[in-house]
Amino acid sequence: EKNVLFAGRKSGHVYALDPDKQGELLWVKRIGKGGFAGGVHWGMTTDNKNLFAAIADTNFINKFPGEPTPGIYSLDGLTGKLNWKFTPQDRCAENEKPACDVGISAALTATNDLIIGGGFDGWLYVLNKDSGKLLWEYNTNVDFSELAGIQAHGGSIESDGAVISGNNLLINSGYLYGGRLGGNVLLNFEVD
């Protein structure tokens, strides 16, 4: 079994390095157009065989050329070969753009069978790890009644990814920095 160190950049490039050979480059692949609000933002994950990367590639400021390729990517960890790509559906109303965008920026979370990621548009996605098939999705960009009876609103899923603890999936929703969809809720889903 080979040790591999993965890195991602806002340029849209992902890298595999050999830590046993002073960081020798094993492969590099560009999966996003990159730019100020593009590429890899907060973190990737692995299942010790494949690399899973979130690509933001938002058109937030329209300063970078090229076609955006937002989504979740699965790459073979040893070769960089694309296993699958999940492209979110654009559900943003024109009056919500550019704050609402289908880019996936938050760190991804992996379990034995699943990849979990969330988007600038507030949608949370649960995918089959092996095929990339969408298994479940939930819109967090809505109003919620908190336990204390106070109204709260979700928004963009950004920065930290989902946390799995026992039978619970925790995710924060709402991230105003950079003109995204503000809000502030911590959601707890029961996982079967």
Question: Model-found features: residue ranges?
Answer:
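Extracytoplasmic/lumenal domain signature
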Residues: 1-104, 109-159, 163-192
